[in-house]
Amino acid sequence: ESRCRRNMLDNSINIRGIKRVAVDMAGYVPAPVCPTSTGKRIAIIGGGPSGLSAAYYLQLMGHQTTVFEKRKKLGGMLLYGIPSYRLPRERLQDDINVILETGVEVRLETSVGNDPGQLSLDELRKEYDAIYIAIGAHSDKKIGIEGEDAGGVISAVEFLRAIGDGKYPDLTGKKVCVIGGGNVAMDVARSSVRLGADKVAVA
């Protein structure tokens, strides 16, 4: 907006606001018609932005895709890392629904790996022509200080994931200290206020 030519007259156009209105008012947008099947089957590990995008465009190429997601819902970090006040769940689900309308198959609560009870890559290779791995970045980062594993200390990823799962921590009357000052830290701080924290400090 700082480069908007309108600044030469008065003020810039509210580009973000216009985009938000456009998305909110667009209504239902049907999925494109997919071409005749190529007969190829592709396994996609991970139901986040990357996996869902790959599934969508592969379906538009005529390939049959199956998304394997270890959690209960699709969306990845869009659901489990971004609070609903920033990305309304209804808008996210609308986009996911359009992707699914192309014929994407989904297997929720299905993990792929080498542990007992998990699907192995070898099993997928036998059934599918190709595998796309889109497992995302869901691991939290430790800062290496004393007490970071103490009771009452929780990582931002774990905190926001719980909210995404609908398991809202009860912070009523509590004091919360958020270490960090980036976007994720702000999400945690603002979510803590919404969860009833008496005081929230960002350090």
Residue ranges and their predicted role:
Residues 9-14, 50, 59, 84-91, ...:
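Catalytic cores of large soluble enzymes that bind and process phosphate-bearing ligands
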Residues 132:
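N-terminal Rossmann-like NAD(P) cofactor-binding module of classical short-chain dehydrogenase/reductase
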Residues 44-68, 108-125, 139-141, 158-203:
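Rossmann-like dinucleotide/flavin-binding elements
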Residues 1-22, 66, 70-73, 103-106:
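Iron-sulfur cluster-binding cysteine motifs and their immediate structural context
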Residues 18, 78-129:
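N-terminal Rossmann-like dinucleotide/flavin-binding domain of flavoprotein oxidoreductases
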